[in-house]
Design a protein with these regions (language model features):
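Start-transfer (signal-anchor) and selected internal transmembrane alpha helices
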Residues: 1-49, 249, 449, 454, ...
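Membrane-embedded helix bundles of polyisoprenyl
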Residues: 38-39, 130-146, 153-235, 246-269, ...
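Periplasmic/ER-lumenal interhelical loops and adjacent helix-loop junctions
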Residues: 62, 66-79, 83, 108, ...
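Active-site lumenal/periplasmic loops and adjacent helix-entry segments of GT-C-fold
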Residues: 45-148, 152-185, 209, 213, ...
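Membrane-interface helix-loop-helix junctions at transmembrane boundaries of multi-pass membrane enzymes
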Residues: 238-248, 339-369
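Contiguous transmembrane helix-bundle modules in multi-pass membrane proteins
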Residues: 197-198, 217, 352-372, 377-501
Length: 557
């Protein structure tokens, strides 16, 4: 990591300074653009696919259709009517709603639904995805500016590289994960500030928010902090005494962050003990994912396939259990990520450590024992390699570091990067679509030619910024469209179906049971989702969620 520069003393703010507003915008213009541009691009992607309010489609697919939307509709009903958030009768004959919220509903944006009509809930979900993609880009820009003391359009370029990475575009329908993923740059920034300056507030708040918004993805944030701790202390080794101090300080502040979320994590933990997932066991024999054989050749085959998934324009994995990890984050990040390893101004130790960090995460996608540990000592049910966004994050940071140090790169460094990208494209033959390979090759060629000319001092860095900006905005727009098209959309015309009739039946059952002490239960003869009771707000027996009590599941057969 670069040495932290001593900051100048801030000038006092006075009421007479009329340029304060303009000064603030001027200072933060690129941070604002890092939010606005992704917001516009992602909204446009949904608009092209005619997602409401731009048409008659909606983003509700797979678990967003069957789980997240019904649960959010149920939560909105509870918030509007002041009902208990500790228990719900709309699922499984009665469930621990606090535990269910801890996994599915703790996005801060969800609490805004109390101010919205229920008819706007689908549009709210769509715009919440847009906001989270934009926030991921903005938080990445904040991280890069704070760490590398850079404030130009490159913040927007590399912010978009993370915000439109394949993980976001493939799993945006998994709205419950997005908050923690988009907070990742803030967790990383808090970690850096803790290590380098001893400042702990951002670290505690960001890590606590990561765990609170989704404890499952928050686990990956905790593992990443551990890996960052190891990497930092190797690169910046300053003796055993300093190392012990770092361990103590990081441990204390991590416990504080976890403690702040204990009121939610403990109910979730005890709830998980009663789920079907609690009986998982550690694999005892060596086995790999992706590769066809459980040996060295299988591992090499898996590495080749994973590297091919850095290809731009490739359709992201959506839910397939045998899919490759979503790790693509733009052609520019791929090219500059290679230049990181050839830069003469980056120490060999830092190159080795960062290379090992990415290598370890790639190997974790392959070796099932590591995959099992990453996912909380469980194997995933569909949607594999859920930590893969961290690979994209590290690569984007490495690429930005290389971009800052382009002056030290030679034409031979650029040629080496071009050869490696060509190798990645070759790896993709037979695995990726032809249009994706050709598109990546063309853009990589443009980038490498420009970098070559820059090393020869033929084109200035301002030209690089302009062209790279156009490239990344184009790639981001394409990634958004490909992501929405691959995920697919559904029609709004019959979801939920028969609302008025269902409401009338529920009112009728309430009137029949109004003078009794017993609580009625009901179920649909023809279901639309796997959580119709939550969707329509009646006392139901069926349920489908990861926090379901296994005994109740067995009871209902």
């Amino acid at each position: 990591m670069p040495a932290v520069k001593k900051r100048k003393k801030a000038e006092p703010v006075t009421l007479n300074n009329k340029s304060n507003g303009k000064g603030f915008f001027s200072k933060n213009m690129f941070i604002v653009l890092a939010f606005v541009i992704p917001f516009v691009l992602m909204t446009a992607a949904f608009g092209v696919m005619k997602v409401s309010p731009f048409g008659d489609n909606q983003i509700l697919v797979t678990d967003l259709w069957h789980q997240y939307y019904p649960f959010l509709a149920d939560m909105q009903e509870k918030l509007k009517h002041g009902e208990s958030l500790f228990w719900s009768w709309t699922q499984g004959g009665g469930v621990n709603y606090f535990a269910l919220m801890s996994y599915y509903l703790m996005s801060p944006l969800n609490f805004l639904t109390v101010f919205l009509p229920s008819e706007w809930l689908r549009e709210f979900l769509m715009f919440s995805v847009v906001i989270k993609v934009a926030c991921a880009s903005m938080f990445m820009a904040i991280f890069l500016r704070s760490l590398f003391k850079k404030n130009d359009f490159s913040l927007v370029i590399f912010g978009c590289s993370f915000g439109f990475c394949a993980f976001f575009m493939g799993y945006y329908w998994n709205t419950i994960w997005l908050d923690t993923v988009c907070i990742t740059p803030l967790v990383a920034l808090g970690t850096v500030k803790l290590f380098t300056e001893g400042k702990f507030r951002l670290y505690i708040v960001s890590l606590a928010l990561s765990l609170l918004t989704n404890y499952y993805i928050g686990l990956f944030a905790c593992i990443f902090v551990l890996l960052s701790f190891i990497a930092y202390n190797i690169v910046k080794w300053d003796g055993i005494k300093k190392f012990a101090t770092n361990i103590l300080r990081t441990g204390i502040y991590s416990l504080i962050a976890i403690g702040l979320t204990a009121f939610f994590l403990l109910p979730a933990f005890f709830g998980l003990q009663n789920t079907n997932a609690s009986g998982a066991t550690f694999p005892t024999t060596f086995a790999i994912n992706i590769g066809s054989t459980n040996d060295l050749m299988g591992v090499l085959e898996a590495i080749r396939k994973i590297l091919s998934n850095f290809i731009t324009f490739a359709a992201p994995a959506i839910k397939e259990a045998d899919a490759l990890p979503n790790i693509a984050c733009g052609t520019l990040s791929l090219v500059l990520g290679i230049l990181f390893f050839t830069s003469k101004k980056i120490s060999l130790k830092e190159k080795i450590v960062d290379g090992c960090l990415i290598g370890f995460m790639i190997i974790s996608c392959i070796i099932r024992q590591l995959d099992y540990i990453w996912h909380g000592f469980h194997f995933t049910n569909m949607i594999p390699y859920r930590f893969s966004y961290l690979i994209s994050f590290v690569l984007v940071v490495m690429a930005f570091r290389a971009f800052m140090l382009l002056e030290s790169s030679s034409c031979w460094d650029v040629i080496l990067a071009a050869l490696f990208v060509a190798l990645v494209i070759i790896f993709g033959i037979g695995t990726q679509e032809t249009y994706a390979l050709v598109g990546t090759a063309v853009i990589a060629a443009v980038i490498c030619v420009l970098l070559f000319l820059y090393t020869k001092r033929i084109v200035p860095k301002q030209v690089l910024l302009i062209v790279f900006g156009v490239i990344i905005i184009g790639e981001s727009a394409a990634a958004g469209y490909i992501g929405v098209k691959t995920t697919t959309v559904t029609g709004t015309y019959d979801y939920p179906r028969g609302e008025e009739n269902t409401a009338q039946v529920i009112d009728y059952m309430d009137s029949l049971e109004s003078n009794t002490t017993e609580m009625w239960r009901a179920e649909m003869t023809s279901t639309q989702t796997l959580n119709d009771a939550a969707l329509n707000h009646y006392n139901g027996l069926s349920m489908f969620n990861s926090m379901a009590n296994v005994d109740m599941t067995v009871l209902w057969g």
